[in-house]
Every structure is written in C-alpha cells, then in structure tokens.
Amino acid sequence: MATPTNNYNTIVGSPMPTATTAATTTTVTPTQKELNIEDLQLFPSILDIISRIKDDEIDLIRAINLANETRTKTIETLNKLPGINRSLENQEELLKTYKQTLKKKVELLEKLKKLEIFEKYNKIKSTSSQSPQIQSKLELQTELSQTEPSQTEPSQTEPSQTEPSQTESSQIESSQIESSQTETEKSKETTEDIMKE
C-alpha cells in the first residue's frame, strides 16, 4: 500500500524519496516562539473586551425585552379605548350627530338668554359684580339723596356734588351694557367657531 506522498511524487514525476531523506524531513520541526511577559499582559485587556461584549449583549437583550413589553402594553391600552373598533364612516356619522346636537343646544341657550327673566337677572348680576369703589359711591349717593330733604341751606352745594355722581353712575351703566354686549358677541363667535370645526 502506497502512502499519499508516494502517490504524489509518482504523479508529479519526481524520484521516490529514500529512507534517509524521509528521516531528515521528519526530524525537522519548526521551533515555536516562547511567550514573553509582554504577550501575557495582553490577556487581561482581551478578557476585558470579551466581557464588555457579553455585558453589552445582555444589556441589549434587556432593552429589547423592555421595548417589547411597553409595545404590548401600549397596544393593549389602545385596544381598550372606547370606539377604537369603529370604522371611519361610523366615526364621521357620530361627529356629525354631535355637531348637530351642539348646534341645537347653542340655539336653545340663545333663546333662553333672550327671555325677559334672564335679562333682568343679567342686569342684577352685572350691578352686583361692580367694584367696591363704585358700590361705595352708589351708597353715598343714596345716603345723600335721603338726607337732602331734611337739610335746608346746604342744599346748594349738595346738588353739585350729586350731579357728577349721577353722571358717573350713568357712565358706569353704559360701560356695563357695552361690556355685556361684547361678552355676548364673543360667546357667539366662539360658538360659531366650534360649529365650523
């Protein structure tokens, strides 16, 4: 039986090796380089690099698991929302009915505001919400008007004092009316904006 080296040599066409040449080839072995201290100092740094890679993999796996958990919780929360299973057409129909209901309610509120009872209430409310200074002036005015008939001579100075206060009260009333009108206009504008949406 022939060895592979013998077959190779016969195929190539070289002469067959003799026993002396075979012995010389087997005795020759490459010498290995001995490890120095410098080579051994690389091991801790290599070990550190490998451990960091493992730690990064563990951290990455934890982060992926946490992201998957939050994603599933979010999907569950979204599925629990009311009306999430409605189609787009159903949602548009609901929106339309809600807008119509809102429009009817706004119209009814406007009708109620125009009733005489509520107009009187709004006037009373606006006079009660006046600042304390205006209320004190009005109280002084009523006190002066009650004391005028009992006094005879100082009546000449008092009417001059009461006249400006009367003009002040009329100005206050007109400003209150204007402010209430602007408030109603603003509320109408906001309701119209809501209806447009």
UniProtKB/Swiss-Prot annotation:
It comes from Dictyostelium discoideum (Social amoeba). One of its GO terms (molecular function) is structural molecule activity. It is found in: Nucleus. One of its GO terms (biological process) is transcription by RNA polymerase II. Belongs to the Mediator complex subunit 9 family. One of its GO terms (cellular component) is core mediator complex. Transmembrane segments: none annotated. Component of the Mediator complex, a coactivator involved in the regulated transcription of nearly all RNA polymerase II-dependent genes. Mediator functions as a bridge to convey information from gene-specific regulatory proteins to the basal RNA polymerase II transcription machinery. Mediator is recruited to promoters by direct interactions with regulatory proteins and serves as a scaffold for the assembly of a functional preinitiation complex with RNA polymerase II and the general transcription factors. Residues 126-197 are annotated as: Disordered. Its main location: nucleus. The gene is med9. Residues 183-197 have a biased composition (Basic and acidic residues). Keywords: Activator, Coiled coil, Nucleus, Transcription, Transcription regulation. Residues 145-182 have a biased composition (Low complexity). Residues 126-144 have a biased composition (Polar residues). Residues 83-117 form a coiled coil. This is Putative mediator of RNA polymerase II transcription subunit 9. Component of the Mediator complex.
